[in-house]
């Protein structure tokens, strides 16, 4: 199995009270999420907010049952989530979904994917 390493998503801006799929498996090619960078990218004065990261199986939806991380961010803070073992997405349609509450966040996901 050959892998490509690097960025799994572009920087994705997610506004308060919204969520977005930032990585989605295509053609049953496994995706290995090694890190998720989240930045509180709100207004120039900054606003504290919360980011939620979900691992959603194909056909599912983001919710308490698949929430993996709950990150409280102060104004203009950046956090890096690096699990000890990669999060593995295996089936077409499996996603990493990220939500923002109370402000705007920017998200970047890095890792490996099958080619």
Which stretches of residues belong to each language-model region?
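Asparagine-centered strand-capping/turn motif at beta-strand->loop junctions
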Residues: 23-27, 38-46
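Intrinsically disordered, low-complexity Pro/Gly/Ser/Thr-rich segments with frequent PxxP/GP/PP motifs
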Residues: 59-92
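Short beta-strand/loop motifs in extracellular/secreted proteins, especially
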Residues: 34, 46-51, 103-107
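C-terminal interaction-tip segments
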Residues: 1-31, 57-59, 92, 99-115
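Hydrophobic beta-strand positions in extracellular immunoglobulin-like domains
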Residues: 37-38, 111
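Short, surface-exposed beta-strand/strand-loop-strand elements in extracellular ectodomains
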Residues: 43-69
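Long, low-complexity N-terminal extensions
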Residues: 9, 51, 69-71, 108
């Amino acid at each position: 199995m050959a892998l490509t390493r690097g960025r799994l998503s572009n920087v994705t801006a997610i506004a308060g009270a919204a969520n977005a799929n930032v990585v989605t498996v295509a053609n049953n090619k496994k995706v290995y999420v090694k890190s998720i960078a989240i930045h509180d990218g709100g207004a120039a004065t900054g606003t504290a907010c919360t980011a939620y990261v979900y691992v959603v199986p194909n056909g599912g939806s983001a919710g308490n049952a698949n929430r993996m991380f709950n990150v409280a961010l102060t104004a203009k803070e950046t956090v890096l989530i690096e699990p000890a073992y990669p999060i593995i997405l295996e089936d077409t349609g499996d996603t990493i979904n990220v939500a923002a509450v109370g402000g705007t966040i920017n998200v970047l996901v890095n890792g490996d994917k099958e080619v």
